[in-house]
Structures are given as structure tokens and as C-alpha cells.
Amino acid sequence: MAPTLVSNAIASPTGKAVTLDPVRPNLGVDIAYQKKLDALIARMAAAMNRAILAVYRANPPELAQDESSPAALRAAMNSLGREWAKRFDDFAEHDAKRFVRSATGSADRAFAASLKKAGFTVEFKMGKAASEIITAAVAENVALIKSIPEQYLTQVEGVVMRGVAVGRDLGSVATELQAQFGVTKRRAALIARDQNNKATAAITRARQLEVGSAEAEWVHSAGGRKPRPTHVANNNKKYKIAEGWLDPATDKRIWPGTEINCRCVSRTIIKGLK
């Protein structure tokens, strides 16, 4: 007997509920995005290091006694900061939408495949709900990408000014700058991974509701080094898709993949036809 399809609402014709395979974020999407971010961050860090070290070499440790030297360092950093803020702005405007569409498109294909495996054929379209999700995801991603150079400059300026104040040598400053580069790269990796998780979770939830699914099973992901105990305890438990699950740790309703660095996903439950 063929599955029932009313508008986009579907039901199992056997009378028994069907649990679909979970939709997971496409790892390739965030890896590709992270590589682009890494390359941009590396160029920014290299430019900043060259400018800072050039001023530092021209004013060795005694520069702490010369007020013009800290001013020259700050001017060099601020000038480069403005330049790289513009470059990250351009990157965000051009690449954020492409990234979100890749993440949500991959999720749609994975969900359609899980439905097809269970015997259902559904073609997803770009309706109002999906369009709003993509718009919101792009806006959040743009804001996060634009924050990268601002946060980097703040941290680098702190490293350099502290170095000037205590008369650190060039080697010490260079070591700290390299460490800050690593911090910024790790933050970019988190942004790529977390935004992929969130976009996948949001579009999947919209599609679940679109096909008439009311419940899903929480699937804890063991990918993180510090799993949330409440998420672990909620593994395989059902929740209402429209309402989300009330996490006792935060006393708020959430969905898989929506909390920062949460890699949990869900199994969609297709109700049985009465």
C-alpha cells in the first residue's frame, strides 16, 4: 500500500509509527567553510605580525620609555584592523549565504533520503518557513564572521601593549602573537561547526513539521569532549517537535543542535495512519 501524502503531511499506511534515520550535519560543509576562514585569518595574522614586528624592531625594549613608539604600534594595528574588518565584511556578505544554503540543502537531501528509505517521496520547496530560517541563519553567520577581526585585534593589542609596558623582547611578543593566532583559528572552527549544526537543526525541524510529524527522538552525539549530562540522559527519548525539550540544566526548551557546540540530532517519527 502506498504511503499517504496530503499536501506535505504524511502518515505510515500500516498503522504503525515509522522512525526515520537521523539527519546529521554534513561534515564536508563546515570543513570547506573552515578552510576558507583559516586562509583569511592566516593572511590577517601575517599582515598584523609584519606591521607590529617592524615597529618593534625599530624600537627595541627601551620603547616603553618612548611615548611615540606605543602610539606608532597602536596606529599600525588600528589601520590594519580597519583594512581586515572590511575584508571580513566582504567575505561574510559573499560566503555566509553560500555556506548556509549548502548546510540547509544538504540537510534537505538527507531528510528526503531518510523518507525515501522508509517508502515516502516528498519534494521540499523553499516556502516561507524555510526562507525565514535561511535568512536568520545568514544574519547570525554574518555577525559572527564580522566579529572575528574585531576580537582578534583587541586581543593582539592587549598582547602588544603589555609587552611594551614590561619591556618584553621581540621573541616573546612573537610567541604570544602566534598563540593568539591559534585562539582565533579555533574560534573560527567552532563558528563553522556550530553554525552548520544550527542551520541543519533549524531546517530539519521546519521540514519535520512540514510533513506533519509531531514527535521525534533525541539522539545524543558522542562527538564532543565534554558532553552535556542532560543531553546524554535524554538520548533516545521522545519530545514534541513544535515545543522542543525542556532541558533541566538550563530550564529552557531547546532542540537538538541548537545549543552552542551541541552535535545532537533527532530521529523523525512518522505517525501511523488511523
Regions found by a protein language model. Name each.
Residues M1-G182, I270-K274:
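N-terminal leader/targeting and assembly helices and adjacent pre-domain segments
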Residues G182-K274:
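Acidic, glycine-rich two-metal-ion catalytic cores of nucleic acid-processing enzymes
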